[in-house]
Amino acid sequence: MTTQLEQAWELAKQRFAAVGIDVEEALRQLDRLPVSMHCWQGDDVSGFENPEGSLTGGIQATGNYPGKARNASELRADLEQAMRLIPGPKRLNLHAIYLESDTPVARDQIKPEHFKNWVEWAKANQLGLDFNPSCFSHPLSADGFTLSHADDSIRQFWIDHCKASRRVSAYFGEQLGTPSVMNIWIPDGMKDITVDRLAPRQRLLAALDEVISEKLDPAHHIDAVESKLFGIGAESYTVGSNEFYMGYATSRQTALCLDAGHFHPTEVISDKISAAMLYVPQLLLHVSRPVRWDSDHVVLLDDETQAIASEIVRHDLFDRVHIGLDFFDASINRIAAWVIGTRNMKKALLRALLEPTTELRKLEAAGDYTARLALLEEQKSLPWQAVWEMYCQRHDTPAGSEWLESVRAYEKAILSQRG
């Protein structure tokens, strides 16, 4: 018997075929686009190095919703629960502070062995892993400087941490058969008027060159660098600005990370993608939702998320853009936060794949901006939801909001027991 979903699917196929879109091909393309989920939503960026320590680096996780993960086993279980509710290919993005060891490990001494459980788990769940050195929430970052620190010994500590992190990243890629993107973000900056803005940037430039000096197989590891406008306590000066890292990534041919919350509120990273791609080999995206500042709210299916997805698809950047998420909301169920944000990113990618881009390009080239706008708006009403629901069914995930029932059941059975 034909189900309601199948009827809607058949009608959707016809509607999209009328504008030249093959929905089966769109779903095949969607399966080429993994989204890297960030582990730190699950525990408010606490990590396992010093879970009771305070979060520093000019970032904040606000809220106190019960049930956050307290160890790696709980975090992996929570991730599995979330991933069951998200269709299609996924990756996991880890920070160095999520290492596992029976004894304390200095950050400049981390090794692949401290992440072997994550690798075995990733293999079992058919996931790729990405990585980040953790240059925050540490006594040697307390004064607001790491890779650009004026003290040679402190700066060297962070250089060695990033070097060690690259080896961990390469281990991920070698073990899992898919390159790990390792992103370097540092909180370095000053609260008030800064007299010497040049010297810290000179030190950062030299430090980064030392960090990436060891040649690693690009099939296993990709270097990325990330800028930021400001952070709490670093409102007046950020060493790693957009101009600094754009220049660095261009001159060193690393990947450039664009975080949706790391620019002025009137700027959007969707407009930066095509410009950056002219100069850098690859991009890493941190899709987030800044509310007035880099607040890292859960990603919505809003105009900017859609614009980011459309830029990737319209310019066929599948093999040059790595899609990651970066938000941490401690005021709501953390598993639901993952599910909402990741599903929204995937919905945006699907909608972009269902766009009649070829026809729109023709109209634009012909100067018919009236028809361009009309088509862009009318396509929003095409039945993409039916295509999404079929995609979810094929991946054995809930199509609609019924996924929330599973989250609530898990919350009652598991999260509520954590105190």
From Swiss-Prot:
Pfam family, one: RhaA
Coiled coil: none
PANTHER family in the cross-refs: L-RHAMNOSE ISOMERASE (PTHR30268:SF0)
Co-factor requirement: Mn(2+)
Cofactor note: Binds 1 Mn(2+) ion per subunit.
Localization terms from the record: Cytoplasm
Pathway: Carbohydrate degradation; L-rhamnose degradation; glycerone phosphate from L-rhamnose: step 1/3
GO cellular component: cytoplasm
Positions bound to Mn(2+): 262, 294, 296
Assembly notes: Homotetramer.
Domain of life of the source: Bacteria
EC number(s) from the headed UniProt entry: 5.3.1.14
Protein name: L-rhamnose isomerase
